[in-house]
Structures are given as structure tokens and as C-alpha cells.
Amino acid sequence: MLNPNNSATASEVVEIDKGLKSPSGLTYRNGDLYVAAISKILRYKDIAATLNSSPEPETITDKLPTKSHHGWKFIEFGPDGLLYVPVGAPCNICEPEEVFASIHRMDVNDPDNTLEHVARGVRNTVGFDFDPVTGDLWFTDNGRDAMGDNMPADELNHVTRIGEHFGYPYIHQGDTPDPEFGEGKNASDYTPPTQNLAPHAGAIGMAFYKGNM
């Protein structure tokens, strides 16, 4: 939406692209627009200068899973300059392949599209941000269904080292074994939440306040 006259409402709507599957992730860096669909991430170079000329996207990667259950990809650049990409579990509760239930990061200029695991055991995060002081990654995670109305809690988690495992599908809310996958698992082997949130709250966003209040 464009507002060249600085009026109260946008005066023009420009279609940048179409036919994408669930393009839910958007971020902007150095003049380029990045869009994440279910299985791919696209870059629209110098988007402000090419809006009116049907910009042709560059495919950053098309190697993301095609599963649509928890398949939306919310993306953001970290303070390290890498693009962070969550890949949710393709189910309510299951023991998925390694690429799922994780947060990854990647160099958008890497021709091999290499994904690095940042966090594992993450069922479905759709909200994450970086501490403006330390640069640490924080994220919310939505807990599984079908364990009752009052459990498990949704979670607020803090990544303190690359590759940490936050429990899914074995341990929920830091201390509760899963009835299907938790047998023989110890809660102490996984990183507990920094804060438990209300069960089934669906915490779908978070951001650090950067004002002066």
C-alpha cells in the first residue's frame, strides 16, 4: 500500500506477487523485501524502486518442508545478520523428522541454502525477537492439544546457546512428560521455559519494548 501524499489513508495498492502458498513471513533489509511462503523464501531486490514494474523475485531457498500443518514461516534477521526461520511440528503431537519443530538460521547469500539449528523441541513458534542489549533470541511456543483445558502451558523461552532442546514432544512446560512420547524422558535434559503462559493461549507474537518509558 502506497501513500505518496502522506494522507490518512493509502491511496494505492500494488500487487507485488501472487500464487504464493501462505506467504506469512515478511521482513526488510538493506532495501530488499523478503517473503516466506510454506516451502520457500523469496527476495525482491530494491523493492521501493521496482514496485511499479512487477519485480521478479530471487529464490533464496526452496528447500523448506512443504507440510502446511504449522507450516507458516515467520522470518526475521538477527543481530548476526542471519535470517531466522522457524519450522513448526507437522502435527499436534508426534516425533517428527529433524528439520521440524525447530528454529533455524541461514545466510541469505549462501548458494547451498544451509540451515543451522538454533533451537530444537519447539512445537509451533509464531513470535520471536532479539534482546536489544544482549542479542539473545527469545520466542513463544504454543503447547500441544488434547491434554485437557488446563495443560500444558504455552511458553516463553530464551535461547542461551545454539542447539538447545526445549522439550517437544517429550516434555511440556518444563516439567510435564508427554503421555505418548514422554516415557523414560527426564525434564532435566531439556531447557525449561523462562515463563509459562496460559494453556492454549496461542501466544502468536512478542517484541522487546525499545522505547524510553
Where are these regions (language model features)?
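A short loop-to-beta-strand structural motif that recurs across blades of beta-propeller domains
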Residues: 1, 32, 40-42, 102-104, ...
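Residue position within the beta-strands of beta-propeller blades
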Residues: 1, 35-36, 84-87, 139-141
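Blade-edge beta-strand/turn elements of extracellular beta-propeller
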Residues: 2-19, 45-66, 98-127, 181-199
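Hydrophobic or amphipathic alpha-helical targeting/insertion segments
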Residues: 23-46
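Conserved beta-strand position repeated across blades of beta-propeller domains
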Residues: 24-27, 76, 129, 207
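Short coil/turn segments that connect the beta-strands within blades of beta-propeller domains
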Residues: 30-31, 80-81, 134-135, 211
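Beta-propeller domain segments
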Residues: 72, 90-92, 101, 105-112, ...
